[in-house]
Design a protein with these regions (language model features):
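Vicinal oxygen chelate
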Residues: 4-13, 43-46, 59-122
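Structural preference for long, well-ordered alpha-helical segments within the folded cores
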Residues: 20-21, 80, 114
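A short beta-turn/loop motif at secondary-structure boundaries
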Residues: 35-37, 58-61, 98-102
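Core segments of cupin and vicinal oxygen chelate
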Residues: 2, 9-51
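Short, charged/polar, Gly/Pro-enriched secondary-structure boundary elements
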Residues: 50-53, 115-116
């Protein structure tokens, strides 16, 4: 049912410095950047088919770490996690594409045992 880790999100204190660091030292390439709700800046970097999501909050807080798992059967995955008693943090919803060649997708967010966010993408 689950295929792979789609992306990992890291909160950083200086978005430009972190983008430069991951591009220069690890070969990542930034492909999209935007300002999200609440003044959070987000930059998406790729290395192969792996995405690193760097976020910076204007208030300096470092909350909301998460990772995302891609699934072949979104509705089945959601049903199984709910059946297993996994707490849902955000209901299933559609998201827009982050780049022109990408299609939007369905996503849902669950919580792990320590409150960590586990995003499921289908």
């Amino acid at each position: 049912m689950f295929k792979r880790i789609d992306h990992v999100a890291l909160h950083v204190s200086d978005l430009d410095r972190s983008v430069d660091f991951y591009e220069e030292h690890f070969g990542f390439k930034k492909y999209f950047q935007h300002m999200a709700a609440g003044g959070m800046q987000i930059a998406y970097l790729k290395l192969g088919d792996t995405v690193l999501e760097l976020t910076h909050r204007s208030d300096g807080s470092m909350k909301g770490f998460h990772f995302c798992i891609e699934t072949e059967s979104f509705e089945e995955a959601v049903a199984e996690l709910k059946k297993g008693g996994v707490e849902m943090a955000r209901a299933p919803h559609d998201t827009a594409a982050r780049e022109p060649r990408e299609k939007g997708w369905r996503r849902v967010v669950f919580r792990g045992p320590d409150g960590e966010q586990i995003e499921i993408r289908g």
